[in-house]
C-alpha cells in the first residue's frame, strides 16, 4: 500500500507548488532572502532604527460557502489577505510578508491555483510578499470539493510611530472609509437569511444592484493599505478595522478610558445589500450594526484640525471617505 492509496497524493502536491511559484514570485520585494519551497522563508529587515513587528492571523469564514456554491475561487484569496493586512495597518504598521494555509480533503490543483492566485493578487495590492504557506491534503476531513483557508501577516512599524490611542480627545472626529460590501463577516447569518429563510438562489438577479446575488456576496474585501499610508504624518488617534462584531464591538477596542464614539447614522450611504438582509431577515438595527460593517470597512479617529487634509488625501488616492461621528465623553461604547 502507498500513501496515495490513503488519499494523499504527494506528486500532485509537488506539482501544485511548482504551479503557484510564479504567482508568489510576482509579489517578491526587497528583504525576501528565500521564499516558497524551503523549510522556512527568510526576510531581512533593513533601514529601521527601532522596529516593532506586528502580526495578525485570520480566515475567510463561511464566505467560502458562497465560493463553493458559485464554483468561483479566484477572489477568496484577496479576502484572506485583506482580513489580515487590514488588522496590521491599524496600529500604523506596513505589511511585510504573508503566509497562507490551504486545507482540503483532496487536492484539486486547478481549483487551488485559483485560490492562491487570489492570495498573490491580494499581496500585490497590499504591497507585501507571499513568502510561504502550507497545502494540507486531509482525506475524509472535509466535504468533497470544499476547503478551508487561513492567513498570517507580519508587518513592521517604528516604535515611536505606533498609533497612540491614549492621546484620543473629546472632539476628535471619526472618519469612515467605505467598504466594498459585506467583506468577510456575517456570512452564516447572510446564508440563513437568503437561502434558508427566503429560498433565494445564488443566481438570482438583484435589479437595484445590477448583479446576481452570488456576485454581490462574493465581492472581495477591500484592502486599505494605500489609503491608510497617505494619512501618515497626520494626528491619527486610532483606527479600527470593522469586521465581525461590526461598529459596536470593534470601535470600543481602540477607545481610551472616559470616551465614547458617537456615530451619525445617515452620514454615509449604506449599501443596498445591508437593507435587503435587514428586511428579509427581520433583523433589528442594533443587531445589524453588531454583525456587519454597514458600508464602512475602516474607521479612522483624527484630530478635528486635520479632517479636511485627511479627506483631501484620501480622495486623491480614490478612497471614498465620510465624516461619520465624533469622540464624546463616555464609558467606552458606541452611541448610534
Swiss-Prot record:
A Pfam family hit: AIRS_C
InterPro entries named among the record's database cross-references: PurM-like_C_dom, PurM-like_C_sf, PurM-like_N, PurM-like_N_sf, PurM_cligase
Keyword presence, Nucleotide-binding: yes
GO cellular component term of the entry, any: cytosol
CDD domains registered for this protein in UniProt: PurM (cd02196)
GO biological process: 'de novo' IMP biosynthetic process; adenine biosynthetic process
Pathway info: Purine metabolism; IMP biosynthesis via de novo pathway; 5-amino-1-(5-phospho-D-ribosyl)imidazole from N(2)-formyl-N(1)-(5-phospho-D-ribosyl)glycinamide: step 2/2
Residue stretches spanning the membrane: none
GO terms, molecular function: ATP binding; phosphoribosylamine-glycine ligase activity; phosphoribosylformylglycinamidine cyclo-ligase activity
Primary site of residence: cytoplasm
EC main group: ligase
Keyword Ligase found: yes
Location relative to the cell: Cytoplasm
Keywords noted in UniProt: ATP-binding, Cytoplasm, Ligase, Nucleotide-binding, Purine biosynthesis
Catalytic activity: 2-formamido-N(1)-(5-O-phospho-beta-D-ribosyl)acetamidine + ATP = 5-amino-1-(5-phospho-beta-D-ribosyl)imidazole + ADP + phosphate + H(+)
EC number: 6.3.3.1
Entry's family note: Belongs to the AIR synthase family.
Name assigned to this protein: Phosphoribosylformylglycinamidine cyclo-ligase
UniProt source species: Caldanaerobacter subterraneus subsp. tengcongensis (strain DSM 15242 / JCM 11007 / NBRC 100824 / MB4) (Thermoanaerobacter tengcongensis)
